[in-house]
């Protein structure tokens, strides 16, 4: 049987460019363990240009093939795409829209689901509509005195807030505010990352994560894992990826009752189904001291770096990542 030509896209040129490259290496290693696939890895730069690993410029055409600027290199037919791009344009749904247009099968959530989850305001509206509890919030559409006043009122009610750019990933443009006088400055910074901002009540809680994915026709939700940070810190971009980070992860969270685990898994699957996610996701929750469960956010293309939770939780659940990938791709292509 002929091999499946898999195009692995990474980079994107945004704040998570380097993280995307690390995740792509995990895909390369996993795909190499199977003789089903022939893989071409391309990096997308800030200018929207694709590069091979040798530095050759190329493009993905509407004929579903890669054409190289060097005319001596023959076009490469594409059967399937893995858009391993964190943030824009991968998790925002933009690149998936192009794949839909040229009828090219791809791994991961479709464009509408990706967009709905990436925008924190839209996502929270969906959570509430689906009956999944989430953190109290307000949202703002421009930086002005009214926005400052609304945020100050929320701060006065809640005592502490998170101010988040509505359409960024990996805690980019996300700030914890404990001092009222800092609100205006932080709001201005957040609006520098996105045209909309969400202000959330700070929740003192455990940070739990669930890998939710499709395998052999079933939707799987793993046992919750846990992110453990220093006291009074949140899981910022630096805490995630800095070499001197004090944060640690537990693939299976300790001291959770079976009832709580089941409730968290039920909410995760409810969100996965209700928002019409596909193939994979990492769904993050808060668990308060009173055992209140709050959905924090959904990551439609979770990181696959050495510290990332998704592949560890999948493996802990008893599934091999290469076999999982092969199953998803084969089911989609009908092979």
Swiss-Prot record:
Primary subcellular site in the record, as a coarse category: cytoplasm
MF term (GO), any: ATP binding
Chain ranges of the ATP-grasp domain: 124-330
Segments passing through the bilayer: none
Biological pathway: Cell wall biogenesis; peptidoglycan biosynthesis
Free-text cofactor note: Binds 2 magnesium or manganese ions per subunit.
UniProt keyword annotation of Magnesium present: yes
Gene Ontology, cellular component aspect: cytosol
Binding site for Mg(2+) 1: 284, 297
Cofactors required: Mg(2+); Mn(2+)
UniProt KW keywords: ATP-binding, Cell shape, Cell wall biogenesis/degradation, Cytoplasm, Ligase, Magnesium, Manganese, Metal-binding, Nucleotide-binding, Peptidoglycan synthesis
Enzyme class, first EC level, given as a word: ligase
Top-level taxon: Bacteria
Catalytic reaction(s) noted: 2 D-alanine + ATP = D-alanyl-D-alanine + ADP + phosphate + H(+)
Subcellular location field: Cytoplasm
Residues bound to Mg(2+) 2: 297, 299
EC number: 6.3.2.4
GO biological process, one term: regulation of cell shape
SUPFAM superfamilies linked: Glutathione synthetase ATP-binding domain-like, PreATP-grasp domain
Residues annotated as binding ATP: 154-209
Family of the protein in this entry: Belongs to the D-alanine--D-alanine ligase family.
Entry-linked HAMAP family: Dala_Dala_lig
Record function comment: Cell wall formation.
Protein name as catalogued: D-alanine--D-alanine ligase
UniProt source species: Shewanella denitrificans (strain OS217 / ATCC BAA-1090 / DSM 15013)
């Amino acid at each position: 049987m002929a091999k499946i030509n898999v195009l692995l896209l990474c980079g994107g040129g945004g704040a998570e460019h380097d993280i995307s490259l690390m995740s792509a290496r995990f895909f390369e290693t996993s795909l190499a363990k199977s003789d089903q696939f022939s893989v071409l890895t391309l990096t997308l730069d800030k200018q929207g240009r694709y590069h091979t690993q040798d530095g050759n410029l190329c493009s993905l055409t509407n004929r579903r093939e890669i054409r190289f600027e060097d005319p001596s290199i023959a076009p490469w037919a594409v059967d399937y795409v893995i858009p391993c791009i964190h943030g824009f344009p991968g998790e925002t749904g933009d690149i998936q829209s192009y794949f839909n247009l040229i009828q090219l099968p791809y791994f991961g959530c479709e464009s509408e689901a990706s967009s709905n989850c990436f925008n924190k305001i839209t996502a929270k509206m969906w959570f509430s509509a689906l009956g999944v509890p989430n953190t109290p919030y307000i949202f703002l559409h421009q930086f002005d005195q009214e926005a400052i006043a609304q945020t100050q009122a929320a701060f006065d009610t809640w005592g502490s807030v998170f101010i988040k750019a509505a359409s960024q990933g990996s805690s980019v443009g996300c700030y914890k505010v404990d001092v009222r006088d800092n609100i205006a400055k932080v709001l201005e910074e957040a609006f520098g990352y996105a045209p909309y901002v969400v202000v959330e009540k700070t929740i003192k809680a455990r940070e739990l994560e669930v890998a939710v994915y499709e395998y052999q026709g079933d939707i799987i939700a793993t046992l919750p894992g846990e992110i453990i940070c220093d006291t009074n810190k949140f899981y910022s971009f630096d805490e995630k990826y800095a070499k001197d980070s004090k944060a640690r992860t537990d693939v299976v969270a300790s001291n959770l009752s079976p009832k709580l685990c089941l409730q968290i898994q039920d909410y995760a699957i409810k969100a996965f189904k209700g928002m019409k996610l596909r193939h994979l996701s990492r769904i993050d929750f808060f668990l308060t001291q009173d055992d209140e469960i709050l959905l924090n956010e959904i990551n439609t293309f979770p990181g696959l770096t050495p510290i990332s939770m998704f592949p560890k939780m999948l493996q802990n659940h008893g599934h091999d990542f290469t076999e999982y990938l092969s199953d998803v791709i084969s089911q989609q292509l009908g092979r």
